[in-house]
Amino acid sequence: MALTEAQVNEFHEHGVVTVEGILTDEDFDPMIETMSAFIDRRAQVLKDEGGITDLYEDKPFLTRYAHIFNQSEEIGRGLDIFELRAKTVFDFLRNDHLLDAVESILGPDISCSPIQHIRAKPPSRLNGSPGFNVPWHQDSGVSWEESDRTLSLTCWIPLVDATVKRGCMEMIPDVIHTGHLEHEAGGGTHIRPDMMPDTGPVAAEVKKGGVIFLSQYTPHRSTPNLSDWDVRWSLDLRYVAYGEPTGRPFFPDFCVRSRSHPERVLTDHEEWARLWVDALEEQRRNPQHAHRV
């Protein structure tokens, strides 16, 4: 779904715009089935190893992960995009409904950045670790400086309704024109406290099917999931104009849309998966620091 002129202007003025109704259940269903199948496999492995006692096969997608997580935090190991490398995920990265909106901001030639994640945020009461609450940061802080010279567009996409109770994001608008704020490491890469904007945060609630579009300079953080068993499932994907740096050059980006040169578009899932396998092996041999601090 293409964005309206008003929505595009809101993004460029404030560094963020939330648009409901971009994606449909039909867009999500294949990927959710893949993630559910992963949970099936991973839970069975953990049970065979004695790590859990109950598979909770009667629980729905919204809550099952949390029930298993309550027995073992290992349920999520291997769940991220670069680990799964599933065809359904590859197809979603090239989803036309999403790319129509992305094109409204980036133009007709688009690459998918390798900075992309599946996130399963279980209820905070199940684990006291602050690692499940990402601190205030800009996406520019988790990429190399090369990406500062172009617009890197983050698409934050909930797979279930993201509410305050379920731990939706908080963000600070109107920082897009300030640019990169100095970050520091420790407790998760975060904006230096003395560099934090004075503007108050806004809760970024969004329904399944909606997308939050963020500039790489818009500060945001996650908040505690205060529900009993609901998991806040979400994706964060990033796109850049074709040929522009992603800020993580040692991992593979690829062309997802090109009006001028459609032959550039990568449609081969196996090739995409191979690019990731090769890049991860090279990263194992010659580690590169992903964040700029």
How would you describe each model-predicted region?
Residues 137, 141-164, 205-208, 213, ...:
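Short, conserved beta-strand element in jelly-roll/cupin
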Residues 120-123, 172-179, 232, 238-244:
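Short edge-strand/loop segments of extracellular domains
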Residues 124-125, 129-132, 136, 146-147, ...:
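A short secondary-structure junction signal
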Residues 9, 162-221:
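Double-stranded beta-helix
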